[in-house]
Amino acid sequence: MLRVGRDSIDFLDHYDVVVVGGGHSGCEAALAAARLGCNTLMLTLNLDKIAWQPCNPAVGGPAKSQLVHEIDALGGEMGKVTDRTYLQKRVLNRSRGPAVWALRAQTDKREYARVMRSVVENQPNLTIREGTVTDLVLGRNDEVVGVVTHFGTIFGCRAVILTTGTFLGGRIWIGRHWQAAGRAGEFAVEGLTDTLRQLGFETGRLKTGTPARVDRRSVDFSVMERQPGDPDVRWFSFDPEVWVPREQMDCYLTRTTPETHRIIRENLHETPVYGGWVEAKGPRYCPSIEDKIVRFADKESHQIFIEPEGRDLPELYIQGFSTGMPEKIQIQMLRSLPGLERCVMLRPAYAVEYDYLPATQLYPTLMTKKVQGLFCAGQINGTTGYEEAAAQGLIAGINAARLVQGKPLVTLPRESSYIGTLIDDLCTKELREPYRMLTSRSEYRLILRSDNADQRLTPLGREWGLIDDRRWALFQAKQARIAAEIERLETQRVKAHDLAGIQLSQLTGQGIKGSATLAEILRRNQIHYSDLLELGLGDAELDPFEQEAAEIAVKYSGYIQRQQSQIEQVSKQYHRPLPPDLDYHSIPTLSKESRDKLSAVRPLTVGQAARIGGVNPADINALLIYLEVRQRQRAADPVCSSL
């Protein structure tokens, strides 16, 4: 670690912001900082692997699609690139309520990376360069002022964003054999973890993995279940300019067999985890196939999805089949699956372990508590998934730019967005396994839907400087049309004896007493906006997404209002700030565990304190009483300093 005033430092060049890493988090961070006017440098190990999808070439899914919609609503890029490069799109959970609808896109991995690279290469204020950052430069006040590459090149800056993915101390495993690498064929980053430890950061190890890739020409699809895309394509971006209708490709479904399970059980000792060579925790919600066989021993079979990696690629991704087995056993496992009896493996599966920083060492702005100007985003914070990484990168990029420009840093409350929920969880909970976003993690999922992400967040994106005039005009016009339609539905009435009233009564099996508004009718379970259109009672000039938004707002208005009231009640206490210098050990009514946890995490609000593991509701009540007493004593005696 270099220090200004102690070491001789020869800066090659100076930037406002340096982003370390060119993955999904790094791209969003670099684009945000550059678009906000900062002279930005993105350093990445390999320019040809910018925005690479090393595991599943897919974007979205439960909770993840909400993140992508929110990234787009704030002015990020992931949704736009996905809409331009998808191979297939499907809405998951469509039979359930809109709170859990999840758009998922299979993407062309090479095209996705190529399009995103073109975006970053052509972004004003953004320079991209190959380089491996192994050290930091600190200023006289322990603030970050630069980075050092493996070959000794030093770049000066006022903010650094670490988006190191799985490369920080990365090690990939196939059976008993390992290699220092962040991904197959790419070097690991050594040295940076040591610098972070010297600065007092706690670090840990996590594990993830990726399945084998097989040659599509060696696969028999006729014995598998076809999984086509949805005919009515939906979009991640709220900007119609990037909507590109494309021919869709099929995915396929097969299943494990008793032979698959036998091979795995007999060879568990050959895997890095069960063999005892890797102790790092893997992702609970994306387990290896051997973990599934062990944890769900009573299940006779597991679903395996066969997914294309590109239009012009012969490679198929075997979703749900990641493993750390030796290659010879991997081939046996693959050939035990129906349709893959004669498959040719092009790339073996492998496990990867890497260093991370528990994110309780960060503020919700994603700046570290120990070093001014140092931000972390993505897998270095303990998350798994492209979408989680991109969301963090966007917020880190915004805040790095605001720090450089002398503006107050910004946060998203957990009740405002899935991004806010994600970051709040990371910064307050002691996570010892890779974190994946789930709809169940949000207490407010009825309000935090995909369809209204722009309504919730685009005004913030505009305020922060990432939504341009064209997007803002589109947003305002759309919201005006939806609001006008909701008002029309709430006021236009249908009489019981009218033809439309009779037809609606027949459709729902419920009569109309005198008359009813269209909104009252739309709230009936059997009625949808499409029914109103068929009867000439809808607005055909609205696009389908505006019609859907109006229907959801009307149909679920009672539930939405109740949840909004809950948020307002909780916010009164949970948004109450906590003094940064509060001595928790001096509060005798707190349990010892909560005093230790609160002192370690240093939450900024009562709400954050309540979500720390080991801090129970009784502790929060004791803390609120203490704050109330402290406030009264200080009001009575302004010079009181005893508390």
From Swiss-Prot:
Residues the entry annotates as binding NAD(+): 282-296
Molecular function GO terms recorded: flavin adenine dinucleotide binding
Keyword NAD found: yes
Cofactor: FAD
Annotated Gene Ontology cellular component terms: cytoplasm
Cellular compartments annotated: Cytoplasm
Residue positions binding FAD: 21-26
Gene3D superfamilies cross-referenced by the UniProt entry: FAD/NAD(P)-binding domain, GidA associated domain, C-terminal subdomain, tRNA uridine 5-carboxymethylaminomethyl modification enzyme MnmG/GidA
Full protein name: tRNA uridine 5-carboxymethylaminomethyl modification enzyme MnmG
UniProt-listed GO biological process terms: tRNA methylation; tRNA wobble uridine modification
Record InterPro entries: FAD/NAD-bd_sf (IPR036188), GIDA_C_N (IPR049312), MnmG (IPR004416), MnmG-rel (IPR002218), MnmG-rel_CS (IPR020595), MnmG_C (IPR026904), MnmG_C_subdom (IPR047001), MnmG_C_subdom_sf (IPR044920)
Family to which the UniProt record says this protein belongs: Belongs to the MnmG family.
Domain of life of the source: Bacteria
Assigned keywords, A-Z: Cytoplasm, FAD, Flavoprotein, NAD, tRNA processing
Pfam families named in the record: GIDA (PF01134), GIDA_C_1st (PF21680), SAM_GIDA_C (PF13932)
Subunit structure: Homodimer. Heterotetramer of two MnmE and two MnmG subunits.
UniProt function note: NAD-binding protein involved in the addition of a carboxymethylaminomethyl (cmnm) group at the wobble position (U34) of certain tRNAs, forming tRNA-cmnm(5)s(2)U34.
